[in-house]
Amino acid sequence: MALASLPKVVMGSVAFGVFWMLAVFPSVPFLPIGRTAGALLGAVLMIVFHVISADDAYASIDLPILGLLFATMVVGGYLKNAGMFRHLGRLLAWRSQGGRDLMCRVCVVTALASALFTNDTCCVVLTEFVLELAAERNLPAKPFLLALATSANIGSSATPIGNPQNLVIAFNSKISFISFLLGILPAMLAGMGINMLMLLCMYWKELDGGACSPDEVAAGKQMEAIEEGRRTALNNNKKDDGDAATPASPEDDDGGDAESMMSENISTKHRWFMQCSEHRRKLFLKSFAYVVTVGMLVAYMLGLNMSWTAITTAIALVVVDFRDAEPCLDKVSYSLLVFFSGMFVTVSGFNKTGLPGAIWNVMAPYSKINHVTGVTVLSVIILLLSNLASNVPTVLLMGDEVAAAAATISPAAVTRSWLLLAWVSTVAGNLSLLGSAANLIVCEQARRATRNAYDLTFWNHVIFGLPSTLVVTAIGIPLIGKINI
């Protein structure tokens, strides 16, 4: 795309710069309005400066992606109410053989769960569990928090529903769920293993000891303590965390919310429920939540429309709950949806200036994915941009350009270029604390924990995050797209 007129390029760059500044530094002193308002401000400036028309701005908002995000948050809320993440927490503690064993469990469970339930959701729910498990065994919290954050990002790379940038890539590339999964799965598994090995090597001495007796695990003392602390926090301080990238509130755990799907407010239930025992009612609702979620994943693999499949699953859970859905819908992070809407408009306007295309034209000859050098250059560009401009804007800015360049090589190269973009932009989030919303969630959840709080600083993270990101990215790249169907 040719460069637009100079005033349009300048005004578009200013509007995008405002968006970028507030996305990376949401509490900047002279304009502390946050990421969500910053995205809206960027969108408004694009229209006010006549970089993009109002009609084009509306057209740039990707409704299928917003619908999938919304439905995924609703389904995730019901799964938390059904105790899904509490069971994951128990799996971490069950017959633990020491600190190193627990470290491996945190890495594996978090990575696999993040691929299915998004990295942000897993970090919201599992952070306090991990803190409690480490404290019970007199183990340092830092290695486990790093394992949680980095494994969540690596694991989320494997599926289109693992993180927001993968959603964008899946919709724009038209790659099916199963092709996306198989294309990145080998890299994800290798990356998870390498990341786990690096954590063990770096913190081997600190992880000595920490074995848990079978009686203690059977009694479930760890999980009871965590739930008690979280319920106390909910009663003492009912307020929003204010993180636009957090898909659901951390207080939505099973048994901790009187408005949850599993609560027994019998007066609001259907008469059919009145004729059932309390145990059967709860068992039916929980079983239904698990069954329809499995059905949703199967539908994804069969190639059905992901957005409407997720929305259908969400509304099925709402209908079977037999209650006013407002309490459940209130837990959706609407600020995240607004952020995405503003970002779509802002990035679309910036693209219309022609500046991203002009910059890419300079880099394209050195970024061919059919050569090792080209793949290396492209990966470095994606990695740097993902940490400077965040991963979702990077995907929106570079996706079409990278795919167009790959189309001159072969159709298979186009698919591999999208998968490469998904892998590198996701793993790049592990480089620093600011590289991923999941990192910030772990940091804030750990700092605000009612029990065993821990302050994970920027430097604590980057000391491990930098080498891990470089090694995991490099090892995963040759494995991208090796399995085709």
Curated annotation (Swiss-Prot):
Gene Ontology terms: cellular component: membrane; plasma membrane
Composition-biased stretches (Basic and acidic residues): 233-242
Xref: InterPro entries: Cit_transptr-like_dom
Protein's cellular compartments: Cell membrane
Keywords: Cell membrane, Membrane, Transmembrane, Transmembrane helix, Transport
Main location: membrane
Membrane topology: Multi-pass membrane protein
Transmembrane segments: 14-34, 37-57, 59-79, 106-126, 180-200, 283-303, 336-356, 377-397, 418-438, 461-481
Presence of the UniProt keyword Metal-binding in the record: no
One BP term from GO: transmembrane transport
Superkingdom assignment: Eukaryota
Annotated region (Disordered), positions in chain: 233-261
Pfam families: CitMHS (PF03600)
Function description: Silicon efflux transporter involved in silicon transport in shoots. In the nodes, involved with LSI2 and NIP2-2/LSI6 in silicon intervascular transfer, which is required for the preferential distribution of silicon, such as hyperaccumulation of silicon in the husk. Silicon is beneficial to plant growth and helps plants to overcome abiotic and biotic stresses by preventing lodging (falling over) and increasing resistance to pests and diseases, as well as other stresses.
Family: Belongs to the arsenite-antimonite (ArsB) efflux (TC 2.A.45) family.
Protein known as: Silicon efflux transporter LSI3
Species this chain originates from: Oryza sativa subsp. japonica
Name of the gene: LSI3
